[in-house]
Amino acid sequence: MSDTPAPRGDEVGATEGSTPPFRVSSASAADDASGTGDLAEDAGLAAELVKALHEVAADLDVIIPLHPRGRATLTAAGLLDAQNIHVTDPLGYIEFMSLVRGAAAIVTDSGGVQEETTLLRVPCLTLRPNTERPITITSGSNRLVTRDELAAAVLKACDDGPYAGELPPLWDGQAGPRIARIVTSWLAQR
């Protein structure tokens, strides 16, 4: 774990006693991968995940916001033995979205993060056998991966660059105006 902040644009905070804040900007996109997840407390699974993260960290900075329980499990499995792995405390929404926006790729098991990466055009790798957000798979912004595939998939996603495909239908940022028109029309008919 690094003792100095990575040189970046917007600060992403950490609390006292954790890794120093990270600075994240889109200029860092070629250098960072980030991950989220609710880690089961299974030492064998943790060891497999740590091995994959170490492979990624050989080429990229890996920034991981972790709940203390997940941090303890992964630390016991040797997570912090790799130089380019940086662990923060859980981040607030705005700070986390800044981290996502500046990442070259995201690894997650969160359905919400799968949607947010699609909208932000950040390649997403979902570390699960399925997703409740299949539109992110069919649109091409997200890919389901196993721990065995993780390192190669992250490096490929970083090499491929930002997601350039079409956003899913109605993901144009205009939900509010559409809802307002429907509600206004409904109220006018009452």
What residue ranges belong to the model's regions?
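Nucleotide-activated sugar donor-binding and catalytic core shared by glycosyltransferases
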Residues: 1-59, 70-190
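Short beta-strand segments
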Residues: 63-65
